[in-house]
Amino acid sequence: RVVNRTGAVIATFFMLITPDMLGFSSLSGTNVIHAVTASLGVIYLAVWFRYRERKDLYLASLLLALNIWTRTEGIVFIGAALCVVGYDSFRRKQYKDLLPVLLSLSPALLWSLFMKLNGLYAEGIAIVRLFWDGEKVETIYNYMKNLYVNNYYYGWSFSAALLSLLVNIRNVIKTRDNLRLLSMILLASLFYVIILYQIDYKWDTIENVLAYSAKRFLFCFVPCVWFFTVTNKIVMTG
């Protein structure tokens, strides 16, 4: 529906051979499963923005709900979706479009209710006050920068997306081509960095979390950036 066959083949092929993602596909962890639900939730929202078919909005919201059910950090994708869909809904005065995305938070709310009713408590690791730690910021920046440019982990995923953005920047500015999808990707990335910053690392070092957990979390962005790459106007029209 969105991209021609050649673009679909190219994006699917390079996504499937993403080195580190391919390696983790053989394990029983939740990383790749989470990547599937999170990325498809974002992608179907991008499809909904193009065609405005309600089924795409509902499917996107369901996938985002599964995403946060799989891993708590998935809230960053719901947060990004709420920002973009919320802005679009208020601009068009179609407020009901925001409801399905809001409902995607229900698994987290139900889990919190279940824990409270059963007297289950987890030690809080979030720092809920505002603070500044320059060393922590520098550590997060350096590790995340190195992850995004690491072709051994993610193949050409982020490099191709950046190139696609640069050659299509005129359409992005003038006609907002793929701007909503780009906004969701960037906002989710920003929210994840904020979470990394606001965590009190009692059980492990921040370096280990960035080197291993964050590395696997970025799997979620691989399908999103390939979809962005092959659906840009200048790429589709040659």
Language model segments and positions:
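Membrane-interface alpha helices of multi-pass inner-membrane proteins
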Residues: 11-16, 57-72, 80-82, 105-106, ...
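Hydrophobic cores of alpha-helical transmembrane segments in multi-pass inner/ER membrane proteins
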Residues: 40, 81, 157-166, 221-231
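Transmembrane-helix signature of polytopic, lipid-linked glycan biosynthesis machinery
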Residues: 19-26, 66-68, 111-116, 186-212
